[in-house]
Amino acid sequence: MTQSLHYSSPRETLTDTIMMAKIRKNLTFEAINQGTGLSLAFVTAALLGQHPLPEQAARVVAEKLDLDEDAIRLLQTIPLRGSIPGGVPTDPTIYRFYEMVQIYGSTLKALVHEQFGDGIISAINFKLDIKKVPDPDGGERAVITLDGKYLPTKPF
């Protein structure tokens, strides 16, 4: 039976347990994800408390991290989403995404509306990918793909 959480602390506690096991076992998110049949981004978000995992994927993850049956069930619950507390983020990496939206948010909105019409890009019917590529000027670049379904506003 599908269960849902009405507050975030159970998943936050589980996330702490998961992260400690990941560190203790010296595992990457990629290694934990192997065998789940799901994307790396989705499983990582689930391990950080933002998505439920299907039972099979929860069991694969639990085996790698030595999690118990209660943790397996909790990994399958629908969480209270939103991992960033109110206000401006202070973590430098998260802040840069905030900064990108501050600078390019109105541009993205204008271009989405111009190309698609009045509506939104779904974060539910959504895929996320990140790749590291060489920078021709030296160093490396991050290529981040946000792939969401367009949902038009429907008058009623």
UniProtKB/Swiss-Prot annotation:
It catalyses: cyanate + hydrogencarbonate + 3 H(+) = NH4(+) + 2 CO2. The active site is at residues 96, 99, 122. Keywords: Lyase. It holds the Pfam family Cyanate_lyase. One of its GO terms (biological process) is cyanate metabolic process. Belongs to the cyanase family. Catalyzes the reaction of cyanate with bicarbonate to produce ammonia and carbon dioxide. This is Cyanate hydratase. The lineage of its organism: Bacteria, Pseudomonadati, Pseudomonadota, Gammaproteobacteria, Enterobacterales. The gene is cynS.
